[in-house]
């Protein structure tokens, strides 16, 4: 699954980013990243990969329910949507004026604001 000796995993997707799905049943669908799981290289995207989750009957709810929830999708199937052009773009990393490593759009060369 993942390398347990790897200390920090650098991902091109962060929570709050708007992304587009590249392949699978939800191809070309866009949504906001709700949660990222760096160890398994997966993310939960709003409105993408909806699955039915069956809840057991309980004292409060004797009938039981079937809920629709978003399931994680692999990060390699996601591409960031650039806010200026509203189109998918590849991401790179380079130093900014302050000497910090920042994400930037490989299409336009502009830095991407975090969050």
Swiss-Prot record:
One of its GO terms (biological process) is translation. GO terms for molecular function: rRNA binding; structural constituent of ribosome. Transmembrane segments: none annotated. PROSITE patterns: RIBOSOMAL_L24. InterPro entries: KOW, Rib_uL2_dom2, Ribosomal_uL24, Ribosomal_uL24_CS, Ribosomal_uL24_KOW, Translation_prot_SH3-like_sf. Keywords: Ribonucleoprotein, Ribosomal protein, RNA-binding, rRNA-binding. Signal peptide: none annotated. GO terms for cellular component: ribonucleoprotein complex; ribosome. Belongs to the universal ribosomal protein uL24 family. One of two assembly initiator proteins, it binds directly to the 5'-end of the 23S rRNA, where it nucleates assembly of the 50S subunit. One of the proteins that surrounds the polypeptide exit tunnel on the outside of the subunit. Part of the 50S ribosomal subunit. NCBIfam families: rplX_bact. This is Large ribosomal subunit protein uL24. It comes from Amoebophilus asiaticus (strain 5a2). The gene is rplX.
